[in-house]
């Protein structure tokens, strides 16, 4: 039995908080100080933790989320009371939906002032509870370490997400007693039970057209590696949701049907409609609504660390709950024969491969200006090699990128799908670069999404972050526009004015570029990639083919 831990006296609760953050292995915190939380910022000066001041609290959560997604360890946001916390909530809701581990510490008024009408008083626990895995206010100084420790456990374990801790000012500023808790390791799960794994192996053996649907958790590096080993021995037909980008490597590309989502009209969607067995790996319904892809005729298997969240269109016949990688290894040992594609599945995969080759050969020949989306995607494919991390904002461009730009490294591409939040790309890029400063990061947004977080260009310049941000410019919220046009045959609230993004970037101290002709696209991107530090490239885009995205688009219609 463990002995009681030695209780230490701390001059300030903030000192115990910071000590607990160090014990958790935190390397940096993102945030904006204020009177209710400034003692924690002061204590951080005497720690090993780097303070990254940001320009908006939501972006602190986005940056922390990128750290969490790439490392598996929760990133940390630190904000003051009232609007400091309310500004944070979009970032926390996004992290929770995307499965990104984030711990946010928010200042609060003194406990004695909670029921008074005082400056910045707000029930932040009630506000954060619906959009986090864990939301708690510390009510006694001797509970500081355990509350913070449990926030990290909640954020990192199971399906990761966000956690929020409210810190009243009197607890932060006043003396505290307590001891730092060691960072707990996630309990090591085993593989799913043998009987359930045997049932899935038998279902695979009996299936004529099995398919894997890879969700967010499938792209965790250890799970992705297990998939690669499994697929190398027993090739399968599979595809990934947008959230699972990078889960399939190049060696298995011949049986990869691409990414699915949004309009239910991709090669993977066609395979799903033909499948008699659908094996969902690391999938959550928030990633792709089951009603969009599950007709109810196929046997449904759920492989994840958590039981399925059931709904009318997602009731698995078999659930393999346990460590995903270990479960896949066990399942692979029970599959005795190579999986043979049906002629229909083989035709779908071959056609997808032909379309990829068509884009590779002819994409650069789309010479209109403003530029066709496929021309930009083709040029981006040349600069996004395996050493580059790509963060993608939300807008029409993200559909073109998700469908036609390929990546083969787990967590190489970050796409928002749970909330489809605009403005994530640049702060995500900053967080990703801080994790791997030796890697170039390319972020991409539309001109609408960019201005929702473009103030963080100053943060990127201050850090000398090696980031290239690409802006697809069309002076409108086009993804909304194409849907409005289809539904109502007219547009409302989707148009806005131009910005000189080259000058805008230079005003922050970044290098600014503007593509001014079709032939200038590739040279400009190469020049921007060569910049050591933040660079911004503005590319005018012609979205007139966007309505095709909602239909049965074949690239031969364009190329």
UniProtKB/Swiss-Prot annotation:
SUPFAM superfamilies: DHS-like NAD/FAD-binding domain, Thiamin diphosphate-binding fold (THDP-binding). Keywords: FAD, Flavoprotein, Magnesium, Metal-binding, Thiamine pyrophosphate, Transferase. One of its GO terms (biological process) is butanediol metabolic process. One of its GO terms (molecular function) is magnesium ion binding. The keyword Nucleotide-binding does not apply. It catalyses: 2 pyruvate + H(+) = (2S)-2-acetolactate + CO2. GO terms for cellular component: acetolactate synthase complex. Homodimer. Belongs to the TPP enzyme family. Does not seem to require thiamine pyrophosphate. This is Acetolactate synthase, catabolic.
């Amino acid at each position: 039995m463990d002995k009681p831990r030695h209780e230490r006296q701390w001059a300030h609760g903030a000192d115990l908080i910071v000590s607990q953050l160090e014990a958790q292995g935190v390397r940096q915190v993102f945030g904006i100080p204020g009177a209710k939380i400034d003692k924690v910022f002061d204590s951080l000066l005497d720690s090993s933790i780097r303070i990254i001041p940001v320009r908006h609290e939501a972006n602190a959560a986005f940056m922390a989320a990128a750290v969490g997604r790439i490392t598996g360890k929760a990133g940390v946001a630190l904000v003051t009371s009232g609007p400091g916390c309310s500004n944070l909530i979009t970032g926390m809701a996004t992290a929770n939906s995307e499965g990104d581990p984030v711990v946010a510490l928010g200042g609060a008024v003194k406990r004695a002032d909670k029921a008074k009408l005082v400056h910045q008083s707000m029930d932040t626990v009630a506000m954060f509870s619906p959009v986090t895995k864990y939301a708690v206010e510390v009510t006694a100084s001797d509970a500081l370490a355990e509350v913070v420790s449990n926030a990290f456990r909640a954020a990192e374990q199971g399906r990761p997400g966000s956690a929020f801790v409210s810190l009243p000012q009197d607890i932060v500023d006043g003396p505290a007693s307590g001891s730092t808790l060691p960072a707990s390791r996630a309990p090591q799960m085993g593989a799913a039970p043998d009987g359930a794994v045997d049932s899935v192996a038998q279902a695979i053996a009996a299936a004529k057209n099995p398919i894997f649907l890879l969700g967010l958790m499938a792209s965790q590096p250890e799970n992705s590696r297990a998939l690669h080993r499994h697929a190398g021995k027993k090739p399968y037909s599979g595809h990934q949701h947008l959230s699972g980008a990078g889960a399939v490597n190049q060696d298995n590309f011949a049986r990869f049907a691409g990414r699915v989502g949004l309009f239910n009209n991709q090669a993977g969607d066609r395979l799903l409609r033909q499948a008699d067995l659908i094996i969902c790996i690391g999938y959550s319904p928030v990633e792709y609504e089951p009603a969009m892809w599950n007709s109810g005729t196929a046997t449904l298997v759920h492989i994840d660390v958590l039981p399925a969240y059931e709904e009318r269109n997602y009731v698995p016949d078999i659930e393999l709950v346990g460590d995903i990688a270990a479960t896949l290894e066990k399942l692979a040992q029970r599959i005795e024969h190579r999986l043979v594609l049906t002629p229909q599945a083989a035709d779908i995969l071959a056609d997808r491969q032909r379309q990829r080759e068509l884009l590779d050969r002819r994409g650069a020949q789309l010479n209109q200006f403003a530029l066709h989306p496929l021309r930009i995607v083709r040029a981006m494919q040349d600069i996004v090699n395996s050493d580059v991390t790509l963060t993608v904002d939300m807008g029409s461009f993200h559909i073109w990128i998700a469908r036609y730009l390929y990546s083969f490294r787990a967590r190489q591409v970050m796409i928002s799908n749970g909330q489809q939040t605009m403005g994530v790309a640049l702060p995500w890029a900053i967080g990703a670069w801080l994790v791997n400063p030796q890697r170039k990061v390319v972020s991409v947004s539309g001109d609408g999404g960019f201005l929702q977080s473009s103030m963080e260009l100053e943060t990127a310049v201050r850090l000398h972050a090696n980031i290239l941000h690409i802006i697809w410019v069309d002076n409108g919220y086009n993804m909304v526009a194409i849907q409005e046009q289809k539904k109502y045959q007219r547009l409302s609230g989707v148009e806005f004015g131009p910005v000189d993004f080259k000058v805008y970037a230079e005003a922050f101290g970044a290098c600014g570029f503007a593509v001014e002709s079709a032939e200038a696209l590739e040279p400009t991107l190469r020049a921007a990639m060569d910049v050591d530090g933040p660079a911004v490239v503005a590319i005018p885009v012609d979205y007139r083919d966007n309505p095709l995205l909602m239909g049965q688009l074949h690239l031969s219609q364009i190329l």
